[in-house]
């Protein structure tokens, strides 16, 4: 959500500030060891905003992802350093993205290679942009698996890109059930009902939610009026190893659920020591 930041702050606040937070508990524990992977995920997420060509840090880009109608944007590639095949999704930069961010109408998802339970519902504003590029991404990942059969899979994104990552994780897990998979969704809002969260939780692989202090976006749509549900393991940080904690459950008050914020806030543009759009592409690293 980097498009016209002030407009986003006002527009999303109108939707979400009126929502009350659920009951919270505090159980987070220090986990500095998680920081390096989340910092790398933040750099790759920033690179998706930058529009890197050829390479983004350790990832060699093999396919740019773009759909004109939905403005879905990102890239697929591989890392010889990490021995992984990566799907990286960009967050919001345009009016089209912003419209997707606030389109919370629930729909029944349909994606090739994915068998959804009948009661799963997700927001149209995330399903529509992902479904526009789903087949392209799965085809490219399949081709890379053929070239690098021993590589693992990963999905990464920030904000709307993080919300798309929550679908990417399910899509990759279902289409490639024999592959090891780790996904990192940064500063993302929840996108579906409890059945969706249960389905995401049931997938093979590891799904992490990385959140920044003073960011209200992870709390959007999570309170009783909308009642969307997160899944995965949350990590919370002010941008350093020492401040990184592993949260317990989805409503740990030591983490994003307890910061009292329910909209786009200044803390949203940073993640695990990286300010989005400022990290470059790693060409000189």
From Swiss-Prot:
CDD domains: Lipase_3 (cd00519). Residues 1-20 form the signal peptide. GO terms for molecular function: triacylglycerol lipase activity. Keywords: Hydrolase, Lipid degradation, Lipid metabolism, Secreted, Signal. Optimum temperature is 30 degrees Celsius. It catalyses: a triacylglycerol + H2O = a diacylglycerol + a fatty acid + H(+). InterPro entries: AB_hydrolase_fold (IPR029058), AB_hydrolase_lip/est (IPR051299), Fungal_lipase-type (IPR002921). It is found in: Secreted. GO terms for biological process: antibiotic biosynthetic process; lipid catabolic process; monocarboxylic acid biosynthetic process. GO terms for cellular component: extracellular region. Pfam families: Lipase_3 (PF01764). Its EC number is 3.1.1.3. The active site is at residues 159, 215, 268. Its main location: secreted. Optimum pH is 10.0. Disulfide bonds: none annotated. Belongs to the AB hydrolase superfamily. FaeA family. PANTHER family: FUNGAL LIPASE-LIKE DOMAIN-CONTAINING PROTEIN-RELATED, TRIACYLGLYCEROL LIPASE, PUTATIVE (AFU_ORTHOLOGUE AFUA_6G06510)-RELATED. Secreted alkaline lipase that hydrolyzes acylglycerol lipids such as triacylglycerols and consequently releases free fatty acid. Is able to hydrolyze tributyrin (1,2,3-tributyryl-glycerin). This is Secreted alkaline triacylglycerol lipase. It comes from Penicillium cyclopium.
């Amino acid at each position: 959500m980097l498009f016209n930041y002030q407009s986003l702050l006002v527009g999303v606040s109108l939707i979400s500030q009126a929502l009350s937070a659920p009951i919270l508990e505090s159980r987070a524990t220090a986990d500095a060891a998680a920081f390096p992977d989340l910092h790398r995920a933040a750099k790759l997420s920033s690179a998706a905003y930058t529009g890197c060509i050829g390479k983004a840090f350790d990832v060699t880009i093999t396919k740019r992802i773009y759909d004109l109608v939905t403005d879905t944007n990102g890239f697929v590639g591989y890392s010889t350093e990490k021995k992984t095949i990566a799907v990286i999704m960009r967050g919001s930069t345009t009016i089209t993205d912003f419209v997707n961010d606030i389109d919370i109408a629930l729909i029944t998802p349909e994606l090739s290679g994915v068998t959804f339970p009948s009661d799963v519902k997700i927001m149209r504003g995330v399903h529509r942009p992902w479904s526009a590029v789903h087949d392209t991404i799965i085809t490219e990942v399949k081709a890379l698996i053929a070239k690098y059969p021993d590589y693992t899979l990963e999905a990464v994104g920030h904000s709307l890109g993080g919300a798309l990552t929550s679908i990417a994780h399910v899509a990759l897990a279902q289409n490639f059930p024999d592959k090891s998979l780790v996904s990192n969704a940064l500063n993302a809002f929840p996108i579906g009902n409890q059945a969706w969260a249960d389905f995401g939780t049931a997938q093979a692989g590891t799904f992490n939610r990385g959140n920044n202090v003073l960011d209200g976006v992870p709390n959007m749509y999570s309170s009783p009026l909308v009642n969307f549900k997160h899944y995965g393991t949350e990590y919370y940080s002010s941008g350093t190893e020492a401040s990184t904690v592993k949260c317990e459950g989805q409503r740990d008050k030591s983490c994003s659920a307890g910061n009292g914020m329910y909209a786009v806030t200044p803390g949203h543009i940073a993640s695990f020591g990286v300010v989005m759009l400022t990290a470059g592409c790693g060409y000189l690293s």
